[in-house]
Amino acid sequence: MPKWAALFMVGAAWLSAADPAGMVLIPGGEYFRGRAFPWSDYEVAWYPNPVKDDSPARKITVDAFWLDAAEVTNLRYAAFVKSEGHRAPYHWRSGQMSAGKGSHPANNVSWDDAVAFCAWDGAKRLPTEAEWEKAARGDQEGKMYPWGDRDITAKDAVFNQIDGPQAVCSKGKVGGLCDVTGNVWEWCSDWYGQKYYASAAPVNPSGPETGQYRVLRGGSWFDVPPLFLTIPYRSWARPGERSPTIGLRCAKSAAR
């Protein structure tokens, strides 16, 4: 096959047609990042003094990239632990994942653990916060959820649970992606900045240069109020935090 035949056009960029296994191509382009809808009485009742760090909503541009279709599973993470001798999540007894949990998302994973896994898994990386929101929004500009503004239900996402996460992709896909909302929070590469949106670069923003916390997006199985599960909601944790509600999903820059 001639070299040109292995290329295709997405936006203004020529990209390799080789599809990384288990990943979805997120087209590059502009979108409005941040909260573009008002706070409801229900949300204020749950969260009376919101930080409102998801504003102002601004138009930004990101390049095309690949994103894992699903959150990293215990099975994938176990292969990494075995291959690299990396520490296992602390809840794995004797360093072994629980039986029957291979298809569940890996959790109790720190930011550094997540970075190391993604590098091992085909020279990937964590998505930037801007990339994560671009993927989560799809064509739902200014909406609350990946499917629009309809209220979230148990058919849409894994949330309001007490027994931990569920198998990935058990709630279906939106735009080829599973569990963008709920199941486990997902680490992003950025440092967290409460007022960062007002000064962020308009093209490929990658977060503040320094900070104490790394960004988390998407909500988890434990979260009750829909507030934490909306697309623009931002959370954070110290890089060394290992929590039952935190997992990961990897990204990869699209070859030009």
What residue spans do the PLM features occupy?
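Short, compositionally biased
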Residues: 2-87, 111-112, 138, 238, ...
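Functional-site microenvironments in short loops/helix caps that host divalent-cation chemistry
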Residues: 25-26, 32, 37-49, 87-235, ...
